[in-house]
Structure formats: C-alpha cells, structure tokens
Amino acid sequence: MIKKLLPLAILAALPFSAVQAAETTTLHVVVTGLKTTTGTIRACVFTTPAEFPSCEKGVGTIKADAPANAPTVKFDIPGVPVGASVAVSLFADVDNSQTMERHFIGIPKEPIGASNNATEPMGAPKFEKARFVAKPNMTVPIALRYY
C-alpha cells in the first residue's frame, strides 16, 4: 500500500507550477515600411542565438507568415513562452520563394527586420541586440530595412 501511495505523495508535494505546462503567449507583430504589396512577411521567434536571424535555418523556432498587402502589416505569433528571452527576425518575401534572396556577396535583396529594430553596421543583427523578455499579449514593432 505504501509503495502505491508514495508516488502520489511525492507528486502532491511538488509546487503546482512544476506540474502545469509552461505558459505561452501571442506576440502581436507590427511591421512598418513595406514598399510593395506583394508577397509574404516571414517571421521567426528565436529562444537562442544559435541560428538567429535565419528563418530558413531556424530549427526549433516559432514561425509565422502574413500577407504583405499594405505598408503596415499586423499579425500574431502564438505559442511564445512567457518570461523567455526571445528575438524576432523577419523578411518580406516579395517573390514568395520561401527564401530570402541575396546579392552575390550576401547582402539581402529583400527587406529585413528584427525586434528592437536591431541592426549592425556590417552583417546581420545580433541576438543580444534583438532580445527581449516575452510578456503576455505583447506588441513587437519592427521597421523593415532595405539594402
């Protein structure tokens, strides 16, 4: 009898938060500066810097697409862990190729953006500059950059 009740007693002693699933939220992304109304906005939420900012390589990232049909595009990204340090990167896939088109030296042909409007003088934005703590129903403004 004790062997049957022991696992239940241990489970009951755990804090409730350890038993329940992690809370998630929806990020409300507002993208500004779109100069065309064709294609798709492709966004990724990263929880680690490993593959940031590449949506194409982003394994384990939360991804979302929205029609690029106005100069300002608003859309939601559900399933983001509350309290997690995350960063958002996106690009306007103007030709709907599902990949970011680049010039021969690697400079993006399509507009790009990142949370906190993170930029670098040379190269892709860094995770640490784009990082923020996800809060419930948070709005994330991102201005597109053209190169």
Describe the residue ranges of each PLM region.
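Sec/Tat signal peptide C-region and signal peptidase I cleavage site
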Residues: 16-23
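Surface-exposed loops/turns
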Residues: 36, 69, 82-83, 136
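Extracellular beta-sheet/turn segments enriched in Thr/Pro/Gly and aliphatic residues
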Residues: 111-147
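Short, flexible loop/turn segments at beta-strand junctions in immunoglobulin-like
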Residues: 33, 76-81
